[in-house]
Amino acid sequence: MPSLSGSDELIFFVNGKKVVVKKPDPEVTLLFYLRRELHLTGTKFACGEGGCGACTVMVSRYSASSKQIRHYPVTACLVPICSLHGAAVTTVEGVGSIRTRVHPVQERLAKCHGTQCGFCSPGMVMSIYTLLRNHPDPTPEQVTEALGGNLCRCTGYRPIVESGKTFCANPTVCQVKRPGRCCLEQEEEEAGSVHTREKMCTKLYDKDEFQPLDPSQEPIFPPELIRMAEDPNKRRLTFQGERTTWLAPATLPDLLELRAEFPQAPLIMGNTTVGPDIKFKGEFHPVFVSPLELPELCVLNSEGDGVTVGSGHSLAQLSDALQSIVSQQPSERTETCRALLNHLRTLAGVQIRSMATLGGHVATRATVSDLNPILAAGKTTIHLVSKEGERQIPLDGAFLEGSPRAGLRPGEIVLSVFIPYSSQWQFVSGLRQAQRQENAMAIVNAGMSVRLEDGSSTIRDLQVFYGGIGPTVLSASRTCGQLVGRQWDDQMLGEACRGILDELRLPPGAKGGQVEFRHTLMLSLLFKFYLRVQRALSKLDPQKFPDIPEEYTSALEEFPIGTPQGTQIFRCVDPHQPPQDPVGHPVMHQAGLKHATGEAAFVDDLPLVSQELFLAVVTSTRAHAKIISIDTGEALALPGVVAVITAEDVPGENNHQGEIFYAQREVVCVGQIVCTVAADTYAHAREAAQKVKVEYEDIEPRIITIEQALEHSSFLSPERKIEQGNVEQAFKHVDQVIEGEVHVEGQEHFYMETQTILAVPRAEDKEMVLHLGTQFPTHVQEFVATALNVPRNRIACHMRRAGGAFGGKVTKPALLGAVAAVAAKKTGRPIRFVLERGDDMLITAGRHPLLGRYKVGFMKSGLIKAVDLEFYINGGCTPDESQLVIEYVVLKSENAYYIPNFRCRGRACKTNLPSNTAFRGFGFPQATVVVEAYMTAVASHCDLLPEEVREMNMYKRPSQTAYRQRFDPEPLRRCWKDCLEHSSFHARKRAAEDFNRQSRWKKRGLAMIPMKYTIGVPVAYYHQAAALVHIYLDGSVLLTHGGCELGQGLHTKMMQVASRELGIPTSYIHLSETSTVTVPNAVFTAGSMGTDINGKAVQNACQTLMARLQPVIRRNPKGKWEEWIKKAFEESISLSATGYFRGFQTNMDWDKERGDAFPYYVYGAACAEVDVDCLSGAHKLLRADIFMDAAFSINPAVDIGQIEGAFVQGMGLYTTEELKYSPKGKLRSQGTNDYKIPTVTEIPEEFHVTLVHSRNPVAIYSSKGLGEAGMFLGSSVISAIWDAVAAARKERKGAESVPETLAVRSPATPEWIRMACVDQFTDMIPRDDPSTFTPWSICVS
């Protein structure tokens, strides 16, 4: 650290108010400062690496040179506060507030039902708001692009995009690029034709209620900042922190002076590389140099032979500049510019593109850089400058590979980059493939350029660069050199492929894995470039250069990023229903406006408590080992550290129901909590946690996979089995028997709000108060009481809302609550425990990986006579919910099909992985994808469509399940029929077959899936519920119940129930929180039964109150509610009532293999259509149609939101979401960089949802629980992918490399799709013997 006399003041504005920081710390981010110092908690912490957009804010800067103000979005978690000198920051609180005025962006997001849990909502608001500040009349494409850097786990994005499109002059952009009318033109017709005897509605909100957007009313940029920017006497700024120094030079000479003095100090512009490296790789820099806003770094000159771009330009600014240049220059001059533009659209999200700079992108030379390969292929040069002078170097292979002779010298900086214009016979392309279309680092990317001799196809110069193949971007220079002088033809392509494989081959166990896939991508991307040049030559001279075959043209078409459209159809409310009765109406989420304004408080938004400490975890780095020692000395010596908590500090039991709070003597998985550190700040706690030294001694066996568990007979529970008919006998009397197995990998919950707990000890009576987001407060209370060795009545758990849960907050908060409570007990001080995203993923695990083995006997007609299923799930190291999950797997495994001879067996395997737990669908999404796999296999063997086999074997009449529960499948048949008809399945299937005949390298697939989904659990006492309703003397009502608001709209529906039962508007009703103090012994909110059971309890309480009020009402029937309440009080009538619902009487006798296991079923059907790129493995979801049996929907907006959100989450399970583990059991997917949930670009271009009416006398108001059912319908997407891949493989049928049966698995990632689409390029890839190397990652299912 330099020796400096003092620190300058940091000046910036937040929401129009001046902020002056006397001693700013360079290590403090804007997110931390907003939340902890300014108490602006609307900006959320969710990932900490700029990958989710929850912390999006708008930064505004004035440029003295251009005299313009620039507004741009940033992720506050990556922005050092020291970089904000002279800037204005706008947070969601500065946009609008319920207390003052709600902004149109916030209002429309809420009223369009674009919020569920609400944790991502402030970031969504800020992304759309920033777009409108720059483009008050945006296009739908701009709305979609603006949201590309924001993640939502609840809604499925459709209503969020729709809210943004309400600001567009023309919000409708038809996605139909094939025969057929626009979906929106058919909307009214569809609504009229579905159940013609019922009136159907298509509008979930009234756009006439929206307040108009008036750009003139937005806050002005602070004049003081303009004066600061134009000050001619600027000087260097120095900010001195606790450990680091920030130096902000005012001039270029000053920058070069600092660079010479501190050559190792990183230059901070956007902090998108250095910031994550500091946080996740433990890097430390005593000095930072930040040359923001230096005019010499912001030059832009497009005159002459190319474009000179200053290194300080953000990637967003670079994109704007290139768009302008491309529009002005002839196309043959802008080959490189257009290639860069194409990549910039999908590189990261808008926030990161607005922060990251061209200079930083070039200088870091990252292997996954999307721009450097293109810049190198385009013969770009770099202008370097230092105190010693200036020089230019080529951005070539030597530079990118890190050659000392070709890189930056000490003291140098990148001043600018020169991108030469291309010539007529030069062709440049950028190509990439990532796990998803946008906001994902490339698996492999490439920059390719060829210069041909004028008028010929002879190669004069060839440049091929690949990222993602080695530690740096690599050049195939040897191969390219050998091809100079050759003709651009098929023979050259074959030699190029062989040469590149030889020159750039990855070792078999290379970091990142996917070796064969990456090798294949190298050739596939080269082939795409080859075709593109062939096509361009034919356009230059059709007589001389033949065009590529018509069926090959699809290889040149990138999947577009469309704007989703769709319809939502539901039953209208009976016109005779009283107007004040909200049941059946699409009512906005009761906290929607609070979500959108950032005023909805989550646990970490609660104000700091006096003497509060922060907790950080130390987790095991071994999968199975003995703990030899824990050395806490160095950690305890650090400033601010109060205590290190271990198993020895647990006053009560350290092991409850098999769950271990703090590891004791041994660890049983990577990620198990060994100890925690309590300190005065989170930064101090985390730093100290990294200093704790744990010595281990490995224990064998180390069991990671299901196969290993089977080998060691390692199980968590006994086998569960159901059987009907005579399976073995039936196999002897069928035409054909097939066998197979399907691996279904796990899934991370990725709730936006990580596990968060505030534990506050009370001085009296050993009481402890916990605030947390959970689905099961009673369970937390039980675990904390056990750990502290106190009665449960001393533990109070308060739960207002959770930022998403999906099953991940049923059991895990109990474990973590006990950990936090023990720390609070030891220190005697409040403990705030907020898991980092990576720690959350590591510790809490997720959906169970599953191995399914099937044996199916069927007739030539496709009729299935016998099925034998074996399921194994990877339960992890402790019981958790694995027993219940495997029971669900077995009970739900028949799905919608009647198989007369059916047997299913299941076991939960014990492994040395973190314990997997409940997840939306509870085993059904894993098990039934195996069922659909064998349905597809049977269809293939019978030369039938899978849909024909499904329909043939579907339940058709009132029946009983394999476990002898009776049901009527009429709604199932109706959903199937309606979906078949209204999705135009057969017409589209024929069109897809025509498309596939005409397209070699892209294939289209369709699939339609039926569903019979169970609601509730087979244990009766888990269906009980209670409520507490108070009526106050002013007529207002306080409602409390035992259910937890997780974003599913439970509180909204409970208010609708209370409103109907009490006959008052919902405005009279307030619902504050769920608490063990008000409603004791409440069961978990899960299994889609929250509304069913809590609604009955609320109804019971309200009916009790209304019965008490009846004498008063009869005497004054025309009186007002307030008058009745006042009179009741005067007559000493109790205005408080508890409500209780005993529950559904379900049971399951596993010894007899029979029972009425579930209260009722939800039925549905979904049709999905996808395009698959056979060369890259990418896929595009074109359309999805969902028909869901909703019975009578209490709130169609909430129910449709649940269906859409579950469908997209299911789609993620089956496509983009891939958990990778090392052979030693370490989770490699720990954050947004490594784990990819769907973004706005993955959802269907056409998304249609119809609620099908039926009757359900079991549930309140004849409704049905719809929180989970849509999850499995996402499997229609993977089934459509299988269909498209089968079409690709059909063209290679008979080839030795193409087995007759496609071995399917989930997820269908780009890797699986590409390698399944076997072709001449996959045939060229060398296969390494698995026994000769250790793989980077393994399949644990």
Swiss-Prot record:
Annotated positions binding FAD: 267-274, 348, 357, 361, 370, 414
Q: Which cofactor does it need?
A: [2Fe-2S] cluster; FAD; Mo-molybdopterin
Residues given in the record as Mo-molybdopterin binding sites:
116, 154, 805-806, 1046, 1087-1090, 1202, 1266
Chain segments annotated as coiled-coil in the UniProt record: none
Q: In which tissues is it expressed?
A: Detected in liver, testis, kidney, brain, Harderian gland and olfactory mucosa.
Pfam families hit by this protein:
Ald_Xan_dh_C, CO_deh_flav_C, FAD_binding_5, Fer2, Fer2_2, MoCoBD_1, MoCoBD_2
Active site positions, chain numbering: 1268
InterPro entries named among the record's database cross-references: 2Fe-2S-bd, 2Fe-2S-bd_dom_sf, 2Fe-2S_ferredoxin-like_sf, 2Fe-2S_ferredoxin-type, 2Fe2S_fd_BS, Ald_Oxase/Xan_DH_a/b, Ald_Oxase/Xan_DH_a/b_sf, Ald_Oxase/xanthine_DH-like
Residues at which [2Fe-2S] cluster 1 binds = 47, 52, 55, 77
Known catalytic reactions: an aldehyde + O2 + H2O = a carboxylate + H2O2 + H(+); retinal + O2 + H2O = retinoate + H2O2 + H(+)
- Boundaries of every 2Fe-2S ferredoxin-type domain copy: 8-95
This protein's source sits in the domain of life called Eukaryota
**Which keywords does this Swiss-Prot/TrEMBL entry list?**
2Fe-2S, Cytoplasm, FAD, Flavoprotein, Iron, Iron-sulfur, Metal-binding, Molybdenum, Oxidoreductase
Q: Which GO terms describe its biological process?
A: xenobiotic metabolic process
**Gene3D superfamilies registered for this protein in UniProt:** 3.10.20.30, 3.30.465.10, [2Fe-2S]-binding domain, Aldehyde oxidase/xanthine dehydrogenase, a/b hammerhead, Aldehyde oxidase/xanthine dehydrogenase, molybdopterin binding domain, CO dehydrogenase flavoprotein, C-terminal domain, Uridine Diphospho-n-acetylenolpyruvylglucosamine Reductase, domain 2
Say yes or no: keyword Iron present: yes
Q: What else is known?
A: AOX genes evolved from a xanthine oxidoreductase ancestral precursor via a series of gene duplication and suppression/deletion events. Different animal species contain a different complement of AOX genes encoding an equivalent number of AOX isoenzymes. In mammals, the two extremes are represented by certain rodents such as mice and rats, which are endowed with 4 AOX genes, and by humans, whose genome is characterized by a single active gene.
Q: Which family does it belong to?
A: Belongs to the xanthine dehydrogenase family.
Q: How does it assemble?
A: Homodimer.
NCBIfam families xrefs: mam_aldehyde_ox
**What is the protein named?**
Aldehyde oxidase 4
Q: What organism is recorded for this protein? A: Cavia porcellus
